[in-house]
């Protein structure tokens, strides 16, 4: 099995506003990056976050392997009008490990679309983040989404929610 890690929107512009547990999430995402066979960075481009701008760039504290691939998107769905499906097919991957930001927008949408496309998914429960919202905290959103993803019913398409350490243990097994 190819250890494919998809890192969503971990960009300077996304983190211009505070996100829950930035430091801890970065540490865990770096652990996944360091042990993955292939890393795909999804980068959102919109408004001030134009492709190539400083705000569009990946957070400087994230590891960026030489063979990493970058896919630019303009919607919450990482597959919408992007080459992501083609990139994954060229890599021969059928199973994706997902992490990144924002839990309740781009991460959630990408997970649901990927599952509907038939990819087997592992979600790093402690390696995605978001911001507090008007009526709910980031921690509550993260916990709620982990629960929803674990229970999501898409027949024949497996979604597993695990901690980073559990994922790494599986990868190193």
Predicted feature residues:
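Active-site-adjacent betaalpha module
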Residues: 2-4, 28-31, 38, 49-173
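Short acidic, Gly/Ser-rich segments with clustered Asp/Glu that frequently serve as metal-coordination loops
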Residues: 11-17
């Amino acid at each position: 099995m190819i250890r494919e890690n998809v890192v969503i929107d971990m960009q300077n512009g996304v983190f211009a506003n505070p996100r829950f547990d930035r430091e801890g999430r970065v540490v865990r995402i770096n652990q996944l990056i360091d042990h993955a066979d292939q890393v795909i960075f999804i980068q959102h481009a919109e408004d001030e976050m134009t492709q190539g701008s400083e705000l569009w760039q990946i957070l400087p504290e994230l590891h960026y392997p030489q063979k990493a691939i970058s896919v630019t998107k303009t919607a919450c769905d990482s597959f919408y009008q992007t080459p992501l499906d083609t990139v994954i097919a060229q890599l021969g991957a059928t199973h994706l490990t997902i992490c990144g930001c924002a839990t309740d927008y781009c991460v959630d949408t990408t997970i649901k679309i990927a599952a509907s496309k038939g990819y087997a998914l592992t979600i790093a429960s402690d390696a995605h983040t978001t911001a507090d919202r008007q009526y709910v905290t980031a921690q509550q959103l993260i916990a709620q989404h982990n629960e929803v993803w674990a229970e999501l019913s898409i027949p024949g398409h497996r979604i597993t929610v695990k901690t980073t350490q559990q994922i790494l243990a599986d990868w190193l097994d």
